[in-house]
Amino acid sequence: PRHRYVDFNQGVDARLFTEENVKQLSRIAIRPLRIAFDNIKTEAQYTRAIEMSSKVGLKDFSNYLLYNFDDHPDDLYHRLRINVELCDRLNVSIYSFPMKYHPIRRTEDMDEDYSHNRDYIGKYWNRKYIRAIQAVLNSTKGKIGKGTSFFMKAFGENIEEYHKLLEMPETMIIYRYFFEWLGLENGGKKTAIEILGNDSICNAR
């Protein structure tokens, strides 16, 4: 027989999870369960929602991680790492899809109308950081799944390595294994610039 699954294509709100709600969700052939994790401030509620879901037998999860909004670049790293660690601890599968925020209409605090371009930069972000994240996602096909070693290779073993990655030339991020083979990834920034050209590295502003 053909197995069919229910997929709510919008993330449910982790703050509204109760034992009864999760019990009812577990009665549905839902795969994956999408739980919103757009703000690091909801970490406790989000983690609790994943734990509660795991206890009733739900094992497949997915979410979009909004960035370039009111968040700090470090927040994206922490949210991704939380998901990877939850996968390991609970033996579940969480696919994360970082999604760049872009306004669809102009508000009073904006200096221009961004509805017809992709130029919006969040308060704590800059163009270089956004391009670096997009370069990583280009290498991972837009998603981050389970696997600590994979995550650490993509985004860094700690926040300091993540910061270094944000400053890397995009070509060096996408073809990192090649540059490692050349021995240029660590301590070879000057040489990399000479190879790639000064235009590959832009000011972090």
Task: Please place each PLM-identified region on the residue numbering.
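Core AdoMet radical
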Residues: 1-49, 59-68, 93-97
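Generic structural signal for well-ordered alpha-helices
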Residues: 22-25, 46-54, 76-84
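Auxiliary Fe-S-binding modules of radical SAM enzymes
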Residues: 70-205
